[in-house]
């Protein structure tokens, strides 16, 4: 990342104000690199092919479009929060853990300055780590009380121990109890119109989570207005947005990103043959832009795991 910044390829968005996590600004070198890649992709996949046409769809997306596609109801991840650090984790990625659970009903400062009645628990490897569990619990209750205190300065109430087996209710990093899982929508929602009601579905809009939906919506118009017929494709390059919980891996997992996409329409009986043809076409393209095919892993996704 530091090399890309020094050479003028990419910078953290709003860096002088602390940075906007998951968003990046491309500098003089980066914007030229992107432009070259997009122009080459468009030339190879649209201009040099007779079976692919292009379009440029709106970023703002009608609520009904994403209701119909299943995004409004299902484009979400189950999330839970660490009660101690407030870190947000994917609930379905928390590993099952076993060990000794220390359970508490509350805590109070020994001098009587505060008292909290709230259940909490900590998971440690064994009873021998009792001090670690108590310290974690003390940190949790001290946060609730708004005070900086150690377990030596407070009384932990109702302590009991119990063997815990294959539980996904604890943060693997520190043993703290997690909140119950809840669904977290991964799309950016907005309201359309100056006097719009955010609870009115007709005034609700979204920043598109992918470019595919506008292609599907305009399929009939493109079919009627262009000299195309099955089998053919529609290509699009454009921005998409996803409210990633934990943006990571540099630009790979970001909240705003650019896609180059082709939706290819064919008769069912031609599908498998065309997949093989397009696979070879893509491998040749990547090789041309400097990614040798021996560096690419081709994964055959089983039917039950496909989106």
Where are these regions (language model features)?
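TRNA-recognition modules of translation machinery and tRNA-sensing kinases, especially anticodon-binding
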Residues: 1-307
């Amino acid at each position: 990342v530091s090399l890309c910044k020094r050479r003028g390829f990419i910078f953290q968005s709003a860096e002088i104000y602390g940075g906007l996590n998951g968003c990046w600004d491309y500098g003089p070198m980066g914007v030229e690199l992107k432009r070259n890649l997009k122009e080459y992709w468009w030339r190879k996949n649209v201009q040099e092919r007779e079976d692919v046409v292009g379009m440029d769809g709106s970023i703002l997306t009608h609520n009904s479009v994403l209701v119909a596609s299943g995004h409004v109801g299902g484009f979400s991840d189950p999330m839970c929060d660490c009660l101690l650090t407030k870190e947000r984790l994917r609930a379905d990625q928390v590993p099952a853990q076993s060990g000794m659970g220390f359970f508490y009903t509350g805590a109070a400062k020994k001098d009587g300055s505060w008292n909290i009645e709230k259940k909490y628990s900590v998971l440690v490897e064994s009873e021998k780590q009792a001090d670690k569990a108590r310290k974690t619990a003390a940190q949790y209750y001290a946060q609730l009380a708004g005070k900086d205190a150690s377990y030596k300065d407070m009384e932990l109430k109702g302590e009991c121990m119990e063997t815990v087996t294959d539980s996904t209710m604890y943060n693997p990093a520190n043993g703290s109890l997690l909140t119950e899982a809840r669904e977290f929508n991964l799309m950016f929602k907005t309201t359309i119109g100056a006097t719009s009601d955010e609870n009115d579905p007709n005034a609700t809009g979204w920043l598109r989570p992918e470019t595919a939906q506008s292609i599907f919506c305009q399929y009939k118009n493109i079919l009627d207005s262009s000299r195309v017929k099955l089998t053919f494709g529609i290509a699009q390059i454009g921005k998409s947005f996803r409210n990633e919980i934990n943006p990571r891996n540099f630009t790979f997992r970001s909240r705003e990103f650019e896609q180059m996409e082709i939706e290819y329409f064919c008769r069912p009986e031609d599908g498998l043959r065309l997949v093989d043809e397009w696979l070879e076409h893509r491998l040749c393209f990547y090789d041309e832009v400097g990614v040798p095919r021996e560096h690419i892993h081709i994964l055959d996704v089983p039917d039950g795991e496909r989106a």
